[in-house]
A protein has these predicted regions:
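N-terminal alpha/beta PP-like core and its mobile active-site loop of ThDP/TPP-dependent enzymes
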Residues: 1-346, 357-368
Length: 369
């Protein structure tokens, strides 16, 4: 069976209905096989950057992982901005790039370039992808595509890049002898244990009982684990004011009485006043970007104890000396734990009144006289 046909079959197996790309000599076999399979529709865009942007927008709107198809040379380099965007915003996706015949990319690597625009594109994007690999053995092509698909959503999501030279795409292989990726081969996440997470949740509940001015800061990581449907319950049950991050703006109704917009450089003044005057800041699924918190972490919510929930331990270590609670966990697991077995909650009416005054005095849109 032809390798490019295996790729088309894989896309159908994963129920990927739409992918994005531009055809070129380097990826013609993949385009042809997908078209002949007839399951996945290829949306042809005008630029490879647009293909990678569309790949991530598809996930943002549909919640389904898809792919971008790039050709070799400038076709691959054009896609990099879209890949960096997906990397920064933790959006999963697979970039499948074509390349010159493997003879011209595998051998004589000390040469600046052999072949026609043949070069090591995975090396170029290795720092902005969760996984990047050039396939030089046709029997491993399906394995690498499967691995990229699973890794893209494993732990903190992100893009993966698989480069398949044209002679590998067109190679005929015995499907039974092809390597298959096993879910059991995924690396362990090494997040907090269930016992540790339970203890952290208990600590946060106690902190909420003690707090006079608590605040939830709700990030895009909540959506990435499919937990946005829990937010109405979270806010309403604890009766705690909330802010959202840029990418999470539509997770909660902007007109919710306890949602005070966004904070940061490009946030609303109301949201910034709420943030700076809280005494307990619970951040869930946000990487605490500089554009939101500023350059000086010690100036953020100066009188507040800060709790951060993030699946990426490196993000927690970034400002670990400022955080009182660093919780390395899935946002959904944390929120579900916080909502479980709850009884009475505090009365934060005075704090809510203060927040409402901020909203009144610093409106998102000035009233028309």
């Amino acid at each position: 069976m032809k390798v490019s046909d295996l790729i088309a079959d894989f896309l159908a197996e994963k129920e990927i209905r739409h992918i994005f790309g531009i055809i070129g000599a380097g990826n013609a076999h993949i385009f042809d096989s997908i078209f002949k399979k007839g399951y996945t529709e290829i949306i042809c865009v005008h630029h490879e950057q647009a293909a990678c942007m569309a790949m991530q927008t598809y996930f943002r709107t549909c919640g389904k992982v898809t792919a971008a198809l790039l050709t070799t040379g400038a076709g691959s380099t054009n896609g990099i901005t879209g890949v960096v965007s997906a990397w920064a915003d933790s959006i999963p996706g697979i970039i499948i790039s074509g390349n010159e015949n493997s003879k011209y990319v595998e051998m004589h690597k000390d040469l600046r370039m052999w072949g026609v625009q043949g070069y090591d594109s995975p090396a170029m994007v290795s720092k902005v992808t969760k996984y990047s690999k050039q396939v030089l053995d046709a029997n491993f092509a399906l394995y690498e595509i499967q691995k990229a698909f699973e890794l893209s959503t494993h732990g903190r999501p992100g893009p993966c890049w698989i480069d398949i030279p044209m002679n590998i795409q067109s190679a005929n292989v015995n499907q039974e002898k092809c390597e298959k990726f096993k879910i059991s081969d995924l690396p362990e996440l090494n997040t907090d244990s269930l016992a540790s997470l339970s203890a952290s949740i208990s600590s946060i509940k106690k902190a909420l009982k003690k707090s006079k001015r608590p605040l939830f800061w709700l990030g895009h990581g909540i959506r990435l684990v499919g937990a946005e449907h829990l937010l109405e319950d979270l806010i309403s049950h604890f009766n705690v004011p909330a802010l959202v991050t840029w990418a999470g703006i539509d997770m909660v109704d902007s007109y919710h009485p306890l949602v005070y917009g966004r904070a940061g450089t490009y946030g609303q003044r109301c949201g910034n006043f709420v943030l700076q005057n809280c005494d307990l800041l619970i951040c869930i699924g946000t990487r605490m970007a500089i554009s939101q918190i500023g350059y000086e972490i010690n100036e953020l919510a100066r009188d507040a104890d800060i709790a951060v929930v993030d699946i990426d331990k490196l993000e927690l270590n970034k400002y670990k000396n400022r955080y009182k609670y660093s919780i390395n966990a899935d946002a959904k697991d944390f929120i579900e734990g916080l909502l479980a077995n709850n009884s009475d909650t505090n009365n934060y009416s005075e704090w809510i009144s203060t927040c409402n005054e901020y909203r009144k005095n610093y409106p998102w849109v000035n009233p028309i006289d």
